[in-house]
Curated annotation (Swiss-Prot):
Cellular localisation: Cytoplasm
Protein name: Proteasome subunit beta
Listed PANTHER family: ATP-DEPENDENT PROTEASE SUBUNIT HSLV, METALLOPROTEASE TLDD
Listed pathway(s): Protein degradation; proteasomal Pup-dependent pathway
Amino acid sequence: MTITGSRGFPDGYLAPGSSFLDFAAQHAPTIMPGTQPTFDTIPQDIAPHGTTIVALEYHNGIIIAGDRRATMGTTIAHREIEKVFAADEHSAIAIAGTAGLAIELVRLFQLELEHYEKIEGTPLSLDGKANRLSTMLRSHLHLALQGLPIVPIFAGWDSTRHQGRLFAYDVTGGRYEEPNFTCAGSGSVFARSALKKLWKPQLDATRAITIALEALWDAADDDTATAGPDIIRRIWPIIAVIDHKGFRYVSEADLAHANDTIAHQRSQDHQHVRVLEPGRDGPGNRLPSQGSATIIPESDQS
């Protein structure tokens, strides 16, 4: 780069414009997504994939959460990956899909928002942020078609409407504002079922956090690529709150307490049964023949 500008800066650094992405595309294109060599097909286990993320509204903002597992094919690649990030002071992004590319996208998105605010002297509107993320996703389309998708959730506090808002995306960059709740990733079909049953209008923050955890528990129960809370290693899902005060993570202590409470409740709700042959009960009891078994819930046993 030739240095010909005033004060010894290269001309590119003095070019007008508030978009860091446009600047990088012109002066350092190799750092941009989608500039690396491509292939006709890419094995599914070539890179770690993040799995399940959820977000939901509560009466004063948004709760956004993600499990901690990344997989490579049938292998657990990481047990403590982070999938929920602050985009700026009043918005958040959660990622599912190809982990390395998604984390790179998050960093570029954070830098893009920061660069815009420094140049313009004011932050982008929430709709502007959501649209900018959509544009960035569209540049990844060819990689998504080769098996390396990125599917984020974006959420933030809208200072104009004085409310939290949720945005879901597809791999083409399509942007969809979602009322109430949304989810993405391999366990999203199970998480969505839990959210449908549990979400109610005007939730408080504590209940909304519990519902997000319940949705991830249900997803982990049926999807091998989604991790539930790891009680032995004390690894919990990551959850963040976005409201008029800004972005903040839920503390480890609060997550541990909430997960322990859910585990206790579910263990109490689980009904164990025993199969007994009439007249014979004990360690030596053999399996009964068809038609002779009696199912006795433990709660009914004396």
